[in-house]
Amino acid sequence: MTVSKFVQIRRDLHRIPEIGFKEWETQQYILDYIGTLSLEFVEVKTWKTGVIVKVNGKNPEKIIGYRADIDGLPITEETGYEFASIHEGMMHACGHDVHTTIGLGLLTKAVSERIDDDLVFLFQPAEEGPGGALPMLESEELKEWKPNIILGLHIAPEYAVGTIATKEGLLFANTSELYIDLKGKGGHAAYPHTANDMIVAASHLVTQLQSVISRNVNPLDSAVITIGKITGGTVQNIIAEKSRLEGTIRTLSVESMKRVKSRIEAIVAGIEASFQCEAIIDYGAMYHQVYNHEELTREFMQFVHKQTDMNVITCTEAMTGEDFGYMLREIPGFMFWLGVNSEYGLHHAKLKPDEEVIEKAITFLSQYVKWKGNRK
């Protein structure tokens, strides 16, 4: 069956997922596609494994930015697609192949239908980690092309195709990685009194961490601690000398993030004393909350409702993390959910976005960009 150009691009990208700052093949694909366009009014830069493209407007007064994240996840794909990932153990399980395709579609429209204002497209690496938005924003490559307004999107499996969802103000949570390493004293399983068991210490720690949210965060201010991975020990008859906990922290306010981390540190100090061990806490990457500019978001929602065939709804804030929040901290703009009607959710090995969304998104976003970019 013949598919449209942009559906094929999405499938091409889906085959080659790459993790953060290793998206060399993806970067080359983007550059090769850009090379097929008329470049009379186009400038292109690379930044690490990302790509920054500027389309010069006819009579620019501002720069409008569109950000698309391009990285995949370390997940083994189970979609059954004929165009499934050819990179073992990696998958586009968060829809970044769709985000990038929509960006290339918008770029194509922008080249053929120039508007007054300049447009900048940020094909950003490493959203899933260690975080590409902040260093890209601070880079020399972007300095002279820094947008005055910026927008981004994220696919939403739970919404139907043709639906977008967003809200003014807080949309996504503050997030932080969490790594805790415990080191005690190993020994023979027959002589537990001579050792300091880090499996037991880790078990106590996981249990105690559950009280951080329930007894330290205002119930009206949501927060979540998730421990997603525990490692420790070597074989069944040796008391473990080391253990490691890996997880995430998510809060809707910066104040709650500080409070949660303070309580984690106090609990870990107690574990050190109780089990006579050493502990190291590493918060890894932290993503700033996604906070939509109220006026721009309201204006966008009204435009979509009145002038496109898309259905726009007001959603509630989510505990999702997104490094686009760093861009919105410095640049007025917004992010929205784009419905893709998938039975399976984000970060699932069977995620299958409905490809019908690609042309719809390119069309309505092109309408919005033209409207916004030709207004004086």
Curated annotation (Swiss-Prot):
A GO BP entry: diaminopimelate biosynthetic process
CDD domains in alphabetical order: M20_Acy1_YkuR-like (cd05670)
Active site positions: D69, E128
Pathway(s) of this molecule: Amino-acid biosynthesis; L-lysine biosynthesis via DAP pathway; LL-2,6-diaminopimelate from (S)-tetrahydrodipicolinate (acetylase route): step 3/3
Listed EC numbers: 3.5.1.47
Protein task: Catalyzes the conversion of N-acetyl-diaminopimelate to diaminopimelate and acetate.
Record's protein name: N-acetyldiaminopimelate deacetylase
Species this protein is from: Bacillus cereus (strain G9842)
Taxonomic placement: Bacteria, Bacillati, Bacillota, Bacilli, Bacillales
